[in-house]
């Protein structure tokens, strides 16, 4: 698969970071690019028991041989960018990352507006990262671009050209999406959504490749979907139910407690169709069946867990190629060669 996109199929927090990190190490892509909105979405990954979280840089940073890129469609917050460069200096990120010169910049005024606007902060439940106001300025053609920020100059590049050149040379390219289908400005639970589309086609556009250059779309689903902030959640369970099941989680960016629900097969099928999914990655199967924890062989999954996977494949209509059975990178079942 010369190029593949990983996107969220629910309301974000599906565990895309752990899937991307695994693919980055297992497949050794030569280029890893991040699409999506901006710093309003955090990806986290556990490496040798230590948790790393990023909001700006690609989660594939752990593949130290890869070129890391931030596509033109992504908003850049210089403060967050440089903080992550320092935080991840052991991975030599600064020497490998490129920002598209056309990226719009999140300024302090955008963050202040995001946090003080009653509609965005109180009703919608925005993360306060400034992404919505920054995208609004971009639509109005008022936003500052990365090429206008002197301190970013050493990192500037043409991401679209780099990626298309890499594909022409037969290199493997991994493209990361952020957030999830249910938060898409067009297809999500409007108005409780993010400030742009989050589907695979939008992520491809963010980094500058056309639809014919995408070979696979991996949509990530969580065994128990979650969402942060306000908005419809048809299969939501009570906090008491979530606590009994050990499903208490907090957002990477906001620190707010996540709402938890039961797996919605109809929503998952619709999400897979709109995203053009060729494969599903299922996370937190060990939360659905605690006896699945740490299993790395599909045939060794307990009956309850295996039946759940088979039901997803049957009702969603897409094969499940990757299954996370725990938080560590090695807690995964890779079925890509047999599906």
From Swiss-Prot:
<feature type="binding site">
    <location>
        <position position="13"/>
    </location>
    <ligand>
        <name>Mg(2+)</name>
    </ligand>
</feature>
<dbReference type="InterPro" id="IPR042111">
    <property type="entry name" value="Adenylosuccinate_synth_dom3"/>
</dbReference>
<dbReference type="GO" id="GO:0000287">
    <property type="term" value="F:magnesium ion binding"/>
</dbReference>
<feature type="binding site" description="in other chain">
    <location>
        <position position="194"/>
    </location>
    <ligand>
        <name>IMP</name>
    </ligand>
</feature>
<protein>
    <recommendedName>
        <fullName>Adenylosuccinate synthetase</fullName>
        <ecNumber>6.3.4.4</ecNumber>
    </recommendedName>
</protein>
<dbReference type="InterPro" id="IPR042109">
    <property type="entry name" value="Adenylosuccinate_synth_dom1"/>
</dbReference>
<feature type="binding site" description="in other chain">
    <location>
        <position position="256"/>
    </location>
    <ligand>
        <name>IMP</name>
    </ligand>
</feature>
<keyword id="KW-0658">Purine biosynthesis</keyword>
<feature type="binding site" description="in other chain">
    <location>
        <begin position="40"/>
        <end position="43"/>
    </location>
    <ligand>
        <name>IMP</name>
    </ligand>
</feature>
<comment type="pathway">
    <text>Purine metabolism; AMP biosynthesis via de novo pathway; AMP from IMP: step 1/2.</text>
</comment>
<keyword id="KW-0963">Cytoplasm</keyword>
<comment type="subunit">
    <text>Homodimer.</text>
</comment>
<dbReference type="InterPro" id="IPR018220">
    <property type="entry name" value="Adenylosuccin_syn_GTP-bd"/>
</dbReference>
<feature type="binding site">
    <location>
        <begin position="12"/>
        <end position="18"/>
    </location>
    <ligand>
        <name>GTP</name>
    </ligand>
</feature>
<feature type="binding site" description="in other chain">
    <location>
        <position position="127"/>
    </location>
    <ligand>
        <name>IMP</name>
    </ligand>
</feature>
<dbReference type="InterPro" id="IPR001114">
    <property type="entry name" value="Adenylosuccinate_synthetase"/>
</dbReference>
<dbReference type="GO" id="GO:0046040">
    <property type="term" value="P:IMP metabolic process"/>
</dbReference>
<keyword id="KW-0547">Nucleotide-binding</keyword>
<dbReference type="GO" id="GO:0005737">
    <property type="term" value="C:cytoplasm"/>
</dbReference>
<feature type="binding site">
    <location>
        <position position="141"/>
    </location>
    <ligand>
        <name>IMP</name>
    </ligand>
</feature>
<feature type="binding site">
    <location>
        <position position="258"/>
    </location>
    <ligand>
        <name>GTP</name>
    </ligand>
</feature>
<feature type="binding site" description="in other chain">
    <location>
        <begin position="13"/>
        <end position="16"/>
    </location>
    <ligand>
        <name>IMP</name>
    </ligand>
</feature>
<feature type="binding site">
    <location>
        <begin position="252"/>
        <end position="258"/>
    </location>
    <ligand>
        <name>substrate</name>
    </ligand>
</feature>
<keyword id="KW-0436">Ligase</keyword>
<feature type="binding site">
    <location>
        <position position="42"/>
    </location>
    <ligand>
        <name>Mg(2+)</name>
    </ligand>
</feature>
<comment type="function">
    <text>Plays an important role in the de novo pathway of purine nucleotide biosynthesis. Catalyzes the first committed step in the biosynthesis of AMP from IMP.</text>
</comment>
<dbReference type="GO" id="GO:0044208">
    <property type="term" value="P:'de novo' AMP biosynthetic process"/>
</dbReference>
<dbReference type="Pfam" id="PF00709">
    <property type="entry name" value="Adenylsucc_synt"/>
</dbReference>
<dbReference type="InterPro" id="IPR027417">
    <property type="entry name" value="P-loop_NTPase"/>
</dbReference>
<keyword id="KW-0460">Magnesium</keyword>
<feature type="active site" description="Proton donor">
    <location>
        <position position="43"/>
    </location>
</feature>
<feature type="binding site" description="in other chain">
    <location>
        <position position="179"/>
    </location>
    <ligand>
        <name>IMP</name>
    </ligand>
</feature>
<keyword id="KW-0479">Metal-binding</keyword>
<keyword id="KW-0342">GTP-binding</keyword>
<feature type="binding site">
    <location>
        <begin position="42"/>
        <end position="44"/>
    </location>
    <ligand>
        <name>GTP</name>
    </ligand>
</feature>
<feature type="active site" description="Proton acceptor">
    <location>
        <position position="13"/>
    </location>
</feature>
<feature type="binding site">
    <location>
        <begin position="284"/>
        <end position="286"/>
    </location>
    <ligand>
        <name>GTP</name>
    </ligand>
</feature>
<feature type="binding site">
    <location>
        <begin position="324"/>
        <end position="326"/>
    </location>
    <ligand>
        <name>GTP</name>
    </ligand>
</feature>
<dbReference type="GO" id="GO:0005525">
    <property type="term" value="F:GTP binding"/>
</dbReference>
<dbReference type="InterPro" id="IPR042110">
    <property type="entry name" value="Adenylosuccinate_synth_dom2"/>
</dbReference>
<dbReference type="GO" id="GO:0004019">
    <property type="term" value="F:adenylosuccinate synthase activity"/>
</dbReference>
<comment type="similarity">
    <text>Belongs to the adenylosuccinate synthetase family.</text>
</comment>
